[in-house]
């Protein structure tokens, strides 16, 4: 459901708020006060590892971490538009380039990040 809120962005493009100022809400599953990125294109919590299958969840509706911008919110939102489970790195390459541009990162840095986690 489109009910999650929280910060996004970075120092390069500035901070913005999901669910406010014309930005869409985050697509999350809600159970009581727990909100989970368990949707069609789920976002997995790797717990600082390189593999896993548990969807990330938080007590909400606002997803913040120590008041900082939330890269996880951006990954979940932009991943919906640029990456689907049926794509692979080569097929999703254009989406990766577009996501990098939208978030103000260099394409090389984003591609390197995917390679480091085995994608």
Curated annotation (Swiss-Prot):
Homology family: Belongs to the peptidase M4 family.
Annotated function: Has staphylolytic activity.
Subcellular location: Secreted
GO terms, biological process: proteolysis
Annotated protein name in UniProt: Achromolysin
Record keyword Hydrolase present: yes
Primary subcellular site in the record, as a coarse category: secreted
EC category name: hydrolase
EC number: 3.4.24.-
Organism: Achromobacter lyticus
A GO cellular component entry from the record: extracellular region
Lineage, opening ranks: Bacteria, Pseudomonadati, Pseudomonadota, Betaproteobacteria, Burkholderiales
Zinc among keywords: yes
Assigned keywords, A-Z: Calcium, Hydrolase, Metalloprotease, Protease, Secreted, Zinc
The organism's place on the tree of life at top rank: Bacteria
Co-factor remark: Binds 4 Ca(2+) ions per subunit.
Any one GO molecular function term: metallopeptidase activity
Signal sequence residues: none
Cofactor field: Ca(2+); Zn(2+)
Disulfide bonding pattern of the chain: none
